[in-house]
Swiss-Prot record:
EC number: 2.3.2.27
Subcellular location: Nucleus speckle; Nucleus, Nucleoplasm; Cytoplasm
Source species of the chain: Macaca fascicularis
Main location group: nucleus
Gene Ontology terms describing biological process: mRNA processing; negative regulation of cell adhesion; positive regulation of cell migration; positive regulation of endocytosis; protein ubiquitination
Reaction(s) the record says it catalyses: S-ubiquitinyl-[E2 ubiquitin-conjugating enzyme]-L-cysteine + [acceptor protein]-L-lysine = [E2 ubiquitin-conjugating enzyme]-L-cysteine + N(6)-ubiquitinyl-[acceptor protein]-L-lysine
Subunit structure: Homodimer. Interacts with tyrosine-phosphorylated SRC substrates. Component of the WMM complex, a N6-methyltransferase complex composed of a catalytic subcomplex, named MAC, and of an associated subcomplex, named MACOM. The MAC subcomplex is composed of METTL3 and METTL14. The MACOM subcomplex is composed of WTAP, ZC3H13, CBLL1/HAKAI, VIRMA, and, in some cases of RBM15 (RBM15 or RBM15B). Also a component of a MACOM-like complex, named WTAP complex, composed of WTAP, ZC3H13, CBLL1, VIRMA, RBM15, BCLAF1 and THRAP3.
Modification after translation, per record: Phosphorylated on tyrosine residues.
Biased composition (Polar residues): 426-441
Protein name: E3 ubiquitin-protein ligase Hakai
Keyword Cytoplasm: yes
Length: 490
């Protein structure tokens, strides 16, 4: 800019500034001469230069200034605009009308363009733009371009009507609702993590499941007496843990079981199975009572009295007591609960003689036996208590006459208490019909009560031995039973 201004000033004024102008122009002329060496008339150039300096200085200045303008002034003014022309336009404020659209835009995997109308492949549920889908179909390819699955038809869907799975790259399945998409994610993609939990659950459930299966088997098996004999071992296996709690009580049960089943297994396992398998036994006794015993009361009584413990023994006793197979099951169930069942022979008199108070020694026992049958309904509780609790069990059996019967159970004198007799007559009709044999086990515990209560607490076998003698005074009907039971108890 300075050079051009000075040059223009020098040309305009031929005064003192002329020398300066000449000096400044000399290099320019030299440069011009060097550039135009081939030209024949250098003077003419001077005249040309001089003339333009005065009249058309724009020629010389234009040539030189053109370059200078582009390099200096012109470059700054026009160059900036050319280099950043957008700045001028974006200086204006722009008001954007409308709202942001939350609807996602998907791009076609075939053409890479945003999809406005979807072509949805059925049944693979992949989407492409409708044009690509139609073209692909026209080519005769009935396979999805994405997954190579056969395509039955192509659905036309608008933007915003589909929900695409993006949980796993490459899935890209589309669904018509968010609910369907979530179900797909849970079923296809979240299932990978679930198998572990399911496996763990399965591991947890298997142990639980087997017992239920055993229980149903027990329920199914009880009807068959022979099966019942097999059932006790399962119950024993299942019940071993509970025996610890019922160890004393179990000992009493063990003698009965020993007689009824293998002593080794019964001594250890039988007590626990009773506690756990009481329910199963109850069911089995119910079935037996229904099948074998005619009276319905047996079902109700047996249901309550059926406490599982006797069930295993009934199977074993059944073969032994073929004469009284039906009654033996319910009664056996009852005595095992009391754990003084070994003296079953007295029960027969109980069923009939129960009403008879003449039996001096056995009457109190009969009373207890009569009262116990109702408790038999609550047989399971008695089983849980230890041997000493057998009396406590009797109170549960005495649930109908709870106050009176328990004391008699503890001691002979209480046994003779008349109130129990009152309860006995009430329960006698039911027991006589339902449990002719059931009453005997109760009578046995009653008869054994004076001598058995202490002995059974210690060793279960001695009470059994004591039981038969106490039974001996019982009427004749009991004796045949005693003969049957005695071999087992002895």
């Amino acid at each position: 800019m300075d050079h051009t201004d000075n040059e223009l000033q020098g040309t305009n004024s031929s005064g003192s500034l002329g020398g300066l102008d000449v000096r400044r122009r000399i290099p320019i002329k030299l440069i011009s001469k060097q550039a135009n060496k081939a030209k024949p008339a250098p003077r003419t150039q001077r005249t040309i230069n001089r003339m333009p300096a005065k009249a058309p200085p724009g020629d010389e200045g234009f040539d030189y200034n053109e370059e200078e303008r582009y390099d200096c002034k012109g470059g700054e003014l026009f160059g900036n605009q050319r280099r950043f022309p957008g700045h001028l336009f974006w200086d204006f404020q722009i008001n954007i009308l409308g709202e942001k659209d939350d609807t996602p835009v998907h791009f076609c995997d075939k053409c890479g363009l945003p999809i406005k109308i979807y072509g949805r492949m059925i049944p693979c549920k992949h989407v492409f733009c409708y044009d690509c889908a139609i073209l692909h179909e026209k080519k005769g390819d009935k396979m999805c371009p994405g997954c190579s699955d056969p395509v039955q038809r192509i659905e036309q869907c608008t933007r915003g009507s589909l929900f695409m799975c993006s949980i796993v790259q490459g899935c890209k399945r589309t669904y018509l609702s968010q609910r369907d998409l979530q179900a797909h994610i849970n079923h296809r993609h979240m299932r990978a993590g679930k198998p572990v939990t399911r496996a763990s659950l399965e591991n947890v459930h298997p142990p639980i499941a087997p017992p239920p299966t055993e229980i149903p088997e027990r329920f199914i098996m009880p009807p068959d007496k022979h099966h019942m004999s097999h059932i006790p071992p399962k119950q024993h296996i299942m019940m071993p843990p509970p025996p610890l709690q019922h160890v004393p009580h179990e000992h009493y049960n063990q003698p009965h079981e020993d007689i009824r089943a293998p002593p080794a297994e019964l001594s250890m396992a039988p007590p626990p199975p009773r506690s756990v398998s009481q329910e199963t036994f109850r069911i089995s006794t119910r079935k037996h009572s229904n099948l074998i015993t005619v009276p319905i009361q047996d079902d109700s009584n047996s249901g309550a009295r059926e406490p599982p413990p006797p069930a295993p023994a009934p199977a074993h006793h059944h073969p032994e007591y073929q004469g009284q197979p039906v009654v033996s099951h319910p009664h056996h169930i009852m005595p095992p609960q009391q754990h003084y069942a070994p003296p079953p022979p007295p029960p027969p008199p109980i069923s009939h003689p129960m009403p008879h108070p003449p039996q001096a020694a056995g009457t109190p026992h009969l009373v207890y036996s009569q009262a116990p049958p109702p408790p038999m309904t609550s047989a399971p509780p008695p089983i849980t208590p230890p041997p000493g609790h057998i009396i406590a069990q009797m109170p549960p059996y005495m649930n109908h006459p709870p106050p009176g019967p328990p004391p008699p159970q503890h001691g002979g004198p209480p046994v003779t208490a008349p109130p129990p007799h009152h309860y006995n007559p009430n329960s006698l009709p039911q027991f006589t019909e339902d449990q002719g044999t059931l009453s005997p086990p109760f009578t046995q515990p009653g008869g054994m009560s004076p001598g058995i209560w202490p002995a059974p607490r210690g060793p279960p076998p001695p009470p059994r031995l004591q039981g038969p003698p106490s039974q001996t005074p019982l009427p004749g009907p009991h004796h045949p039973d005693q003969t049957r039971y005695r071999p087992y108890y002895q």
